[in-house]
Amino acid sequence: MLKSTLEAFSDTNGKARAAAINGTVELTNLIPPTVTYESRGDLLIVGAQEHITALADQFSELHSVTLLATDATEAKAGFSNLYFSQDVSAKGYLGAFEVTCQVAGQLTKANLAKVAIGRDCFDLILDMTENGIMSLEIPAPGYYAVGSRKDKLAQLVEDLPAMMGTFDKPKYFRLNPDLCAHSSRGVEGCDRCLDACPAGALSSDGVEIAIDPYLCQGVGTCATACPTEAITYALPDPQNTQNFVHRVITRYKQEGGEKPTLLFYGNRDEKAVTQALATLPSSVIAIALEELATVGVDTWFSALVYGAHQVLLATNTKYIPATIDRVLSNELAMAQRFLTEMGYDADRICLFDFSDVETYVPYQEALVTPVSEALTGSKREKLFTSLEMLYTEASTKPEQSSVAEKAPYGSVSCDTKDCTLCMSCVAVCPTRALHAIGDRPGLLFIEEDCVQCGMCEKACPEKVISLEPRFNWDWQARKEAKLVHEEPAACCISCGKAFAPASMVKMLTEKLQGHSHFQGDAIRRISMCEDCRVRDIFEQMEKDPASQARV
């Protein structure tokens, strides 16, 4: 349908668009990793007794049907598979639903599957309760929340018997813990991805982020929210998406097309997009994504420097979950803030409502001279490169811009008079934005690498570091290693080796002079390097063996 709509245009732009979309292959993983579900067909129906007992016989093709009534009426005769509980909790996915409740004859909560069918779990859940026993914005595979919408039952009666067997789906993400800024050495940091998943697939044990591939629905908001690319979308990966965008625009122009506008949309909106393209100008090029939120500011701005005059984001507010809407809105607000700070119109990147098809007017001019090659590097590097190009040709050139509180851009400030250069901040920094000078006591900072995770602020024992959310438009200042603090080194009083910041040695001497282990000449060891300190301890033991008991 989409192809025929594109080919219906006979003008130059229309022909160029059809050639670009039909003739550009998106390189992706043709055999992606998969996740496998196993279902024996054990169904649990939850809801009011009157409703669930009326349905039981309609699922006779399934392996088993268990009924769980949530009202307090008396049991109907003839239903040995009927249980009662008003306190029900459930977790899991297709083939592995664990339902816990307190049923008659049990003093405590029990696994209902073990009680009812002798298994650890149910395979499917049909939920007819008003509020649902699982509260995820995007239901887990195998969980069907009907509530009071009885019109859905007929289709489920037909569909559920087919949910027995083995089912595969793609594994939509890649997770690299080495890049994650969530925690380090017991200090908690970035948590942007945790509240970005509407499917409940992400969790944290306080040390690492985990993604349950069985709950993941491929929405991509976690990857968009992740500032370090510890989480990346895999179908396709962001670089392939951007390369595809670049090739489409390049092919469009090679075929004679002019003034391209990109319209990103999720696959489920293909019908609405096809209808819209029949009316929109033929210079509007539609780019399909698995989900709209799988790409963010780096892809949007890359499209502008590839030659797109405008980037439109097709959204359907009738079904978009609140979490996706929030992540997308935050990302869009940041993009539009960058644009307006440079004097560009905010709607060069904007949401597109299908009801505006008739009144849409495209931009006639590009913002910059398009780049000839697709951008490479991390998503931050591609974003910064795009912004630098736009900044160069901007009418307004700000030095710094404020950003939202949790935006992954900014600096750190340090109250240097109380800094001891203990390097606790360096030890936890996940991106090496903060790092030591190396050959002498000192602390350096690279603003472009800072994702504002906050671990340095929490790890500092002297509480002298604080975050400064902002965007620095001076690309040289943003990239260079800036000196935060430096001081003379303390030299070992025994061998002369520089071994620690002088202020730290002074501070430790003052704090430990009353300690039992540092009485008399022992206090001198604080002013020694590690080798001389050990040597001095053993020399003292040799002279006074009884001193071993005091070390």
Spans of model-derived segments:
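Short linker/helix segments within small regulatory modules
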Residues: 206-210, 439-444, 482-486, 506-526
